[in-house]
């Protein structure tokens, strides 16, 4: 058996040493290379580092050197997956990493390339605890519009030409060539940036006015290695041709003539348009007048119909009021519920507001905040109607409330809290205390208010006895005893001192409810309202506060209230 050659063993050992101490990541020849990508296209940036076979990539990061913050990356690849953390906001969702198996490396793809993406990119590769980085450059390029050539002017045998184009990046360069293909000298070059950061270019040159053939303008984009060319044909001049001013005049005069003809045509057209517009406006006005007449007739018919309906409603309300009066009851006031500032007559049918509180027992039934009083009657079934004389009072509250309403403290009056009330707030302004409140006006202010309760039907209606009209109706399903409610309200600077008076008998409407002087003959069937003498002189009555007196002229007014005989 032959022994191995010492030289062969040495060679194997050297190769093993090279393999062991060879770095896992090596630099390719692509380091520092410039890559070009069209605007809004996809850029491919190969990482200039490659891995030895069987080496496992731990992490790869792409950075923009010089961009802050340094910790944010363009793309992060770690543990075999793309990562979203620590990414620059402008690159999120636009990058991807593709494996280049041929070079044992990776390619960074940037979609929808922008001008701001151009510049230096750094690829950093980690294998275990070892890392290495190197750079590549991205250049963004845009091929602009086709060049446009036009004659800028004429000057002493020369024709000055201007070549323009827009939408280039990076800055292009322009080349003029004459009819023989020779390069022409550029007279001026202007390059500017538009709002999108792309270059506009305008380059001028000139040729002799006796030149014949094509003149071309070529704009080059060196980054893309592409160009765009436009040519202009120069015609042959005739012998003895006119001078430049004559040529200009020969061009200007026909154009001026065309402009004059065009102006005349436009004036005639505008005149016809105005006439047509005036005719259309006249027709529109005529149609509007006709429509107005029709609408006026329609509104007249509608108004006539509404008046008829209103007349029927008034007749129905009048009939309802007359039926309600068939259920008249004599209501009295309950002194145990009266607020301490209220003063009641001895027969408990009149109530007014005093100047101070009376020393009365603070029983549970008495109102201590709301200046009100309830009727003595409890209604749990049937129909009931009563009338209250309000006279010239400017404020009052009348209606019905549940026996269970709170008597202590401030209470919001509403059907939900067991109150079905109507209030005169000021002048001819009235409110039904619903939730929210319902405001309305009356054609004639009532001197006497009728209140009708139909317990089973769940109806509480208010009537103006003065003109026999309906005021307001509440509807509700009642389940507890109901009682009449009275509140004379504050004095209103002395204009509201008159009392609320419960009528002992039905009152006539219109003139008969106005108090008459004593001594005049009464109408047939009329009787005087019977009043207790203590109403005029309340001293000594347990229902009045000492030194509080009723007005001296109240007696004749109360005696003048008339009621019809039924």
From Swiss-Prot:
Subcellular location, record wording: Cell membrane; Cytoplasm
InterPro entries associated with the record: B30.2/SPRY, B30.2/SPRY_sf, BTN3A2-like_Ig-C, Butyrophylin_SPRY, ConA-like_dom_sf, Ig-like_dom, Ig-like_dom_sf, Ig-like_fold
Main location: membrane
Family under the similarity heading: Belongs to the immunoglobulin superfamily. BTN/MOG family.
Recorded topology in the membrane: Single-pass type I membrane protein
Pfam families: C2-set_3, PRY, SPRY, V-set
Any Gene Ontology CC annotation: plasma membrane
Native species: Mus musculus (Mouse)
Modified residues (Phosphoserine): 509
Post-translation changes: Glycosylated.
Protein name: Erythroid membrane-associated protein
Keywords, alphabetical: Cell membrane, Cytoplasm, Disulfide bond, Glycoprotein, Immunoglobulin domain, Membrane, Phosphoprotein, Signal, Transmembrane, Transmembrane helix
Annotated S-S bridges: 47-123
Side Cytoplasmic, residues: 268-566
Tissue expression pattern: Expressed in spleen and bone marrow.
Annotated B30.2/SPRY domain residues: 311-509
Glycosylated residues (UniProt): 135, 214
Keyword Metal-binding: no
N-terminal signal peptide: 1-29
Chain's gene name: Ermap
Entry's transmembrane regions: 247-267
Extracellular compartment residues: 30-246
Segments forming domain Ig-like V-type: 30-139
General function of this protein: Possible role as a cell-adhesion or receptor molecule of erythroid cells.
């Amino acid at each position: 058996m032959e022994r191995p050659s010492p030289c062969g063993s040495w060679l194997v050992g050297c190769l093993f040493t090279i393999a062991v101490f060879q770095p896992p990541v090596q630099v390719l020849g692509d380091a520092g290379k410039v890559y070009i990508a069209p605007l809004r296209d996809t850029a491919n940036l190969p990482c200039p580092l490659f891995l030895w076979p069987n080496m496992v990539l731990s992490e790869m990061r792409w950075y923009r050197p010089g961009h802050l913050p340094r910790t944010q990356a363009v793309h992060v690849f770690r543990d075999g997956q793309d990562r979203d953390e620590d990414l620059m906001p402008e690159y999120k969702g636009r990058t991807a990493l593709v494996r280049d198996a041929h070079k044992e490396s990776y390619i960074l793809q940037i979609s929808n390339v922008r001008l701001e993406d151009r510049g230096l990119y750094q690829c950093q590769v980690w294998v275990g605890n070892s890392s290495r980085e190197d750079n590549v450059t991205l250049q963004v390029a845009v091929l602009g519009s086709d060049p446009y050539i036009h004659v800028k002017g004429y000057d002493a045998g020369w024709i000055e030409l201007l070549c323009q184009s827009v939408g280039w990046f990076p800055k292009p360069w322009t080349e003029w060539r004459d009819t023989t293909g020779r390069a022409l000298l550029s007279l001026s070059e202007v390059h500017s940036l538009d709002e999108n950061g792309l270059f506009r270019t305008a380059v001028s040159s000139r040729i002799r006015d006796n030149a014949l053939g094509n003149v071309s303008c070529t704009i080059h984009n060196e980054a893309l290695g592409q160009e765009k060319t436009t040519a202009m044909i120069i015609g042959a001049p005739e012998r003895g041709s006119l001078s430049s001013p004559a040529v200009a005049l020969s061009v200007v005069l026909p154009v001026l003539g065309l402009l004059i003809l065009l102006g005349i045509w436009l004036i005639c057209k505008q005149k016809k348009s105005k006439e047509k517009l005036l005719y259309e406006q006249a027709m529109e006005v005529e149609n509007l007048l006709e429509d107005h007449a029709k609408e006026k007739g329609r509104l007249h018919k509608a108004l006539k119909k509404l008046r008829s309906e209103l007349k029927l409603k008034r007749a129905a309300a009048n009939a309802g009021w007359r039926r309600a009066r068939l259920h008249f009851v004599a209501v009295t006031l309950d002194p145990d519920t009266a607020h301490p500032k209220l003063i009641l007559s001895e027969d408990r049918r009149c109530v007014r507001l005093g100047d101070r509180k009376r020393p009365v027992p603070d029983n549970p039934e008495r109102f201590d905040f709301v200046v009100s009083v309830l009727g003595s009657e409890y209604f749990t079934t049937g129909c009931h109607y009563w009338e209250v004389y309000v006279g010239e009072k400017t404020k009052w509250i009348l209606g019905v409330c549940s026996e269970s309403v709170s008597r202590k403290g401030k209470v919001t009056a509403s059907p939900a809290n067991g109150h079905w009330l109507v209030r005169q707030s000021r002048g001819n302004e009235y409110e039904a205390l619903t939730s929210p409140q319902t405001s309305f006006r009356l054609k004639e202010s009532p001197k006497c208010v009728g209140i009708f309760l139909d317990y089973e039907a769940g109806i509480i209606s208010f009537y103006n006895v003065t003109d026999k009209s309906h005021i307001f109706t509440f509807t509700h399903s009642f389940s507890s005893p109901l009682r009449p409610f009275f509140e004379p309200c504050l004095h209103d600077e002395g204009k509201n001192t008159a009392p609320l008076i419960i009528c002992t008998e039905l009152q006539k409407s219109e003139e008969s409810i106005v108090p008459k002087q004593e001594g005049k003959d009464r109408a047939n069937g009329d009787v005087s309202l019977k009043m207790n003498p203590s109403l005029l002189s309340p001293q000594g009555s347990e229902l009045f506060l000492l030194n509080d007196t009723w007005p001296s002229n109240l007696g004749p007014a109360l005696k003048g209230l008339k009621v019809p005989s039924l």
